[in-house]
């Protein structure tokens, strides 16, 4: 199984277009050891030819252009992307569907019932796309049972609900429902190795812990370093957990949890532009490295 990180940043990417936080300012001044990052998305394949896209970010066109395996190879109009799994209905994970409207066949979209509702009402992308290529929506199970995707041989997918947040536009932003956010286990049926993908994690529930323990690679929420990061950066008073993200540092933080999982490859993704781990010379980045935790970047490839 091949995992390609198309985008490793949180909403807005890095640098964010209107941000002058320490990281963004220093990046523009070329005074920081950091890589730019587009908004989070990955692609997964068993054979390197037929790929499943996880989330469709607003940066999808440039992400796919930088990813030769997705380019047309069998005719005038073609793509290596055969299906799309949506983790949630956040704007930075779904807007890219509009950029895929030139598809010559309906987009095969796998998502929860709650995401389907959001993308049919509050942010009606599915209805808009009916006037272009169309969408064939497939509802994923939330009980952890496995499913396969037609045309994607050698991979099995399992999904479960996570405690995080529905997007701000959703009518149930402050009234959580199962399926607002999901985690995904992708299993390589040839060798049994597993990826656990959860770019938005607000709480480690027992079923999440079990999935993390069973995985050979964890690609998980790296949004914030500290609970009050947005306040510390002078941006707003929202706390990390209020926005549905476990910070890396502090009691019960992501780093503490990852330190109890010594056998898996551990990679943080969905990294906010304010997070000091973007600076590869920072003490926070060094702390992660010493703990065996990687920071995802655009173009990273993982083989399981």
From Swiss-Prot:
A Pfam family hit: Lactamase_B_2
Keyword entries, A-Z: PQQ biosynthesis, Transport
Pathway involvement of the protein, from the record: Cofactor biosynthesis; pyrroloquinoline quinone biosynthesis
Name of the gene encoding the protein in the UniProt record: pqqB
Alphabetical list of SUPFAM superfamilies matching this protein: Metallo-hydrolase/oxidoreductase
Function: May be involved in the transport of PQQ or its precursor to the periplasm, in association with PQQ biosynthesis, but is not absolutely required for this synthesis.
GO annotation terms (biological process): pyrroloquinoline quinone biosynthetic process
CDD domains membership: PQQB-like_MBL-fold
Domain of life of the source: Bacteria
Family: Belongs to the PqqB family.
Organism this protein belongs to: Methylococcus capsulatus (strain ATCC 33009 / NCIMB 11132 / Bath)
InterPro entries: Metallo-B-lactamas, PQQ_synth_PqqB, RibonucZ/Hydroxyglut_hydro
Name this protein carries in UniProt: Coenzyme PQQ synthesis protein B
């Amino acid at each position: 199984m091949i995992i390609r990180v198309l985008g490793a940043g949180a909403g807005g990417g890095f640098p964010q277009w209107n941000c002058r936080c320490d990281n963004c300012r220093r990046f523009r001044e070329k005074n920081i050891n950091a890589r730019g990052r587009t908004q989070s998305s990955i692609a997964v394949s068993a054979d390197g030819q037929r790929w499943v896209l996880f989330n469709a970010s607003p940066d999808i066109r440039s992400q796919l252009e930088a990813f030769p395996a997705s380019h047309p190879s069998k005719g005038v109009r073609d793509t290596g992307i055969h299906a799309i799994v949506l983790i949630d209905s956040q704007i930075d994970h779904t807007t890219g569907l509009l950029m895929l409207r030139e598809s010559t066949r309906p987009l095969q979209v796998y998502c929860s019932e709650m995401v389907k509702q959001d993308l049919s009402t509050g942010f009606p992308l599915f209805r808009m796309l009916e006037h272009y290529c169309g969408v064939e929506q497939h509802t994923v199970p939330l009980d952890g049972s496995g499913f396969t995707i037609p045309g994607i041989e050698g991979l099995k997918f399992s999904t479960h609900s996570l405690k995080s947040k529905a997007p701000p536009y959703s009518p149930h932003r402050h009234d959580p429902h199962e399926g607002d956010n999901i985690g995904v286990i992708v299993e390589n049926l040839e060798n049994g190795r597993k990826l656990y993908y959860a770019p938005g994690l607000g709480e480690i529930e027992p079923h999440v812990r079990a999935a993390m323990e069973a995985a050979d690679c964890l690609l998980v929420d790296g949004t914030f370093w500290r609970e009050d990061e947005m306040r510390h950066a002078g941006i707003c008073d929202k706390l990390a957990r209020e926005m549905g993200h476990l910070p890396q540092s502090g009691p019960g933080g992501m780093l503490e949890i990852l330190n109890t999982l010594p056998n898996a490859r551990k990679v943080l993704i969905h990294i906010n532009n304010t997070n000091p781990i973007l600076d590869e010379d920072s003490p926070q980045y060094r702390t992660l490295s010493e703990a065996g935790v990687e920071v995802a970047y655009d173009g990273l490839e993982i083989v399981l």
